[in-house]
Amino acid sequence: MKKFLLILTNQPYNGTDNAYNALRLAGALKNRGEYVRIFLMNDAVDLARNSTQKPENYDFDLVAKLKELHANGVALKVCGSCDARCGLHAGEPYFDSEIKGSMDILASWVAECDQVMTF
C-alpha cells in the first residue's frame, strides 16, 4: 500500500474543477486500497465548513464528498492558522473540530508519504 497526500489550496467552486478532481482522485485511490491523506490550506479550507454551499449550477457537492471520504477512512487535516483568515467563510468553524491541523502535521505527512500532489 502506498501513501498519498493531496494538498488542496484553491477556493471550492471557483470556476475550475481543481477541488472536484482532487476529491475524485482521493476516492479512486482509496477504492484501490491505498492510504490517502488530504490537507486543506489557503482558501481550500472552505471545503471543511458547513457554511459552504453547492451553487445551483454545480452538480457535485464538494463538502458532502469530503465528509464522505473522511468517514470512509481518508485522513483529513485543515490548516489551523487559515481558519480565521482564509476563504469566503473565514472564521466560521470546520465541520469537525478534530480536523484542525498545523504546519508541523503537514510537514510530518509530507515526510511520510510516497507521493504528494497539490491542487
Regions found by a protein language model. Give the residues of each.
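Short, glycine-rich nucleotide/cofactor-binding loops
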Residues: 4-20, 48-53
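Histidine-anchored nucleotide/phosphate-binding helix
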Residues: 18-32, 38
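Short internal beta-strands
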Residues: 26, 36-41, 76-80
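Short amphipathic alpha-helical segments and helix-helix/interface helices
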Residues: 26, 63-67, 106-107
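Anion (oxyanion) recognition and catalysis
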Residues: 30, 70, 110-111
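Short, active-site-adjacent cap segments at secondary-structure transitions
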Residues: 45-48, 85-86
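A glycine-rich helix N-cap at a beta->alpha junction
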Residues: 54-82
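C-terminal structural segments of small proteins and small subunits
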Residues: 86-112, 117
